[in-house]
Structures are given as structure tokens and as C-alpha cells.
């Protein structure tokens, strides 16, 4: 068992419980034990199929494999789980679920978050028949516990957007970290292309809190964020950051920029659609006063990075005054965030670096 998988199991069951004998649940490890991403319960096919909703790969091959495995599960054969392990019952977690929901025989699936010092464990909580009751987030590291706490605070300030954002069922200290139990959002995975439903949701979001900021203030704020990580980067990265800030300053220093509440990680995999309405979850990166448009920038860049396409195929930043400067600041801020949270995320970091260099070269 890898160290990451062991840590997730310990967090789930409790370190002491995980090492004791007693009832154990079998989980399939996807895509493999060497590269664990999701743990799906094996047994009752209804709970297994519901757990597969938790596993949402976007790569074509992984989606095909998921579809094939779901068809096998429907036959009732459990031999499909080639990579599996047995995990002790999470007694503390079961007691919490019973207290909050009344369900005394919950079934669980687990999702390991992105690698890095903010890595979290997300646990899908279901009834034995497969109905999802909610999701538990647990910080695996101390910094990730702070992020879970941040998400709880954000959700408690977004009650006006319910039921299109999760509701906090429970939040509090747990196993020297922090735990958030939130309600599920319903629907199918959201589309990978920006549409009217995305804009409608973002307009409702920004209506919660809106303020105007001098453009130069935004440049200084992003500069401070960048400097927190730039000192440990190669001098070429430092030069790229300095050039980006100088270019953005020239674009924005005489402008006033509307800002408001932003999701911070607005992307297809954090959305669901039902009856033509968008629901959004995973709010740990929420910001009170981000420039309007940063969520749409992020959505487009994340999709373009995943599909290895140019972000320029999605929208034109020359469409309005200051848009290019704001895009430069978004890229630098996003690059700083990725370097801080996932320094080994080569593709995401490299995509943003190349996008910055390309945009700066276009204006030189």
C-alpha cells in the first residue's frame, strides 16, 4: 500500500481503528493501488454504482473503462475489482453520520484529492441502497485542514444560493484536523463548454458581494501573492513574473475594476446540471473580492489545459478595456497558487507559463 493510500485509510477509519481487528469493508481502488484516486465499495451493486458517480475521469480511456466496469457491476459479479483492499469500519464517522442523518448503516466511497500539501480526503456517504446523503471532507495535512475550515465558512455565507450550492450539515475539529459534512448537489456532470447557465450562476454569485477596486491595487495584491512563491523559483520565472506585473500595470493603472465573490476553482468537474440549472461545489478557494471574469478565465484555462488546446480558442481578451491586463494577473495568480499547492503538477504549471510568455510576446 502506498503512503498516500495508507494515510487516507487512517484518516477514514481513525488511526487506532485502522490497525485493529473487526468488521472490514472491501473497496476497489481506482485506477490502481499504485496510483490511487478513488475507493469504491464492493458488495451491494446499488452502492457500488452510486460510488462510481464519485469517480469522474475526463480522459477518454478512463471514461470508457468506467462505463465498462459499471456494466459489469450490474451483473452482480464482484471479481471486476482487481485492485482492492479491506478497510476497518470508521466507528467515529459512522456515529457522526447517525447523529446528523439518522442513518445507522452508512456505506462509503472515498476520493483522494490532488497531490500536495493541501491534499484532502472526500468521503461519499450513502444509505445501504445507494442514496447519497452527503459528502465529508477531511484534511489529510494540517494546511489542508485549514482549507476545509475555509470551505465551511464560505458555504455558510452562500445560503442565498441554495439549493445550487451544498448546505453545511456539520463542521468541526476532527482527529487533529477539520471535518466538513455537506449535503449533495444533484444532477449530471456539468458541460466542458461555458454557456448561459454558467454566466447566470456567476451573476447570482457576484450579487452577494460586489466592490470596485483601483486597477493598481489588484496589481499590487497579485504581486504580493507572486512574491510569496517566486523567491524559491528559477530566475527566469522571477523575470516572467516581473514582466507580467509591469505589463498588467500599464493596462490597469488608470482603470477601476469591478470585483466580487468568486468560486476560485470554477471548472466542469466542480459543477452539476439538473433541469437546466447549474449547481456548484468545492468552495475551498472562494474569494470575496476577486475581479469579475476570473472565474470564466479559470474555467476556460482549465479546460484548455486538460484538452491541450489554446485558451484563445475560447474568448478574446481584447473585447473590453482592461480584460487583457486582468487575464495576465489571473494567469500569474493562478501560477502562484499552483506552485504553492501542487509544485509537482507539471502540466498545469507549464501551460500557464507558456500562456503568459505567449501573451507577453504578442504585445512586444
Regions found by a protein language model. Give the residues of each.
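Short beta-strand micro-motifs within the conserved protein kinase catalytic domain, predominantly
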Residues: 167-177
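ATP/Mg2+ or Mg2+-diphosphate-binding catalytic cores
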Residues: 311-312, 337-364
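Juxta-kinase regulatory segment immediately upstream of eukaryotic protein kinase catalytic domains
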Residues: 2-111
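Conserved short submotifs of the Hanks-type protein kinase catalytic core
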Residues: 177-187
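Conserved kinase catalytic-core helix
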Residues: 151-166, 185-226, 242-267
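ATP-binding glycine-rich loop module of kinase domains
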Residues: 119-149
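Conserved catalytic-loop position in the HRD/HxD motif
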Residues: 265, 270, 282
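Active-site Asp-x-Gly
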Residues: 274-316
Amino acid at each position: 500500500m502506498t503512503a498516500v493510500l495508507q494515510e487516507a485509510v487512517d484518516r477514514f477509519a481513525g488511526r487506532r481503528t485502522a490497525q485493529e481487528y473487526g468488521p472490514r469493508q472491501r473497496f476497489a481502488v481506482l485506477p490502481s493501488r499504485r496510483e490511487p484516486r478513488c475507493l469504491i465499495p464492493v458488495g451491494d451493486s446499488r452502492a457500488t454504482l452510486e460510488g462510481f458517480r464519485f469517480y469522474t475521469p475526463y480522459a477518454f480511456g478512463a471514461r470508457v473503462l468506467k462505463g465498462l466496469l459499471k456494466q459489469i457491476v450490474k451483473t452482480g459479479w464482484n471479481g471486476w475489482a482487481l485492485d482492492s483492499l479491506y478497510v476497518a469500519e470508521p466507528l467515529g464517522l459512522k456515529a457522526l453520520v447517525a447523529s446528523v442523518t439518522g442513518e445507522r448503516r452508512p456505506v462509503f466511497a472515498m476520493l483522494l484529492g490532488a497531490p500536495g500539501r493541501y491534499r484532502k480526503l472526500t468521503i461519499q456517504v450513502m444509505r445501504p441502497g445507494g442514496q447519497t446523503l452527503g459528502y465529508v471532507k477531511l484534511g489529510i495535512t494540517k494546511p489542508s485542514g485549514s482549507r476545509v475550515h475555509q470551505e465551511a465558512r464560505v458555504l455558510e455565507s452562500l445560503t442565498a444560493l441554495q439549493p445550487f450550492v451544498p448546505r453545511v450539515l456539520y463542521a468541526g475539529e476532527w482527529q487533529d484536523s477539520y471535518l466538513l459534512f455537506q449535503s449533495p448537489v444533484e444532477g449530471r456532470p456539468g458541460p466542458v463548454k461555458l454557456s448561459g447557465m454558467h454566466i447566470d450562476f456567476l451573476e447570482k454569485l457576484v450579487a452577494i458581494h460586489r466592490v470596485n477596486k483601483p486597477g493598481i491595487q489588484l496589481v499590487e495584491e497579485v504581486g504580493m501573492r507572486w512574491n510569496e512563491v517566486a523567491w524559491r523559483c528559477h530566475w527566469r520565472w522571477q523575470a516572467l513574473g516581473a514582466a507580467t506585473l509591469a505589463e498588467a500595470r500599464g493596462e490597469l493603472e488608470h482603470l477601476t475594476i469591478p470585483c466580487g465573490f468568486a468560486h476560485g476553482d470554477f471548472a466542469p468537474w466542480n459543477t452539476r446540471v439538473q433541469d437546466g440549472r447549474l449547481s456548484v461545489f468545492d468552495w475551498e478557494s472562494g474569494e470575496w473580492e476577486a475581479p469579475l471574469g476570473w472565474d470564466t478565465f479559470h474555467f476556460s484555462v482549465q479546460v484548455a489545459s486538460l484538452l491541450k488546446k489554446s485558451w484563445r480558442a475560447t474568448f478574446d481578451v481584447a473585447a473590453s478595456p482592461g480584460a487583457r491586463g486582468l487575464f495576465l494577473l489571473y494567469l500569474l495568480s493562478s501560477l502562484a497558487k499552483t506552485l504553492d499547492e501542487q509544485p509537482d503538477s507539471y502540466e498545469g504549471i507549464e501551460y500557464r507559463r507558456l500562456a503568459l510568455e505567449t501573451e507577453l510576446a504578442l504585445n512586444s
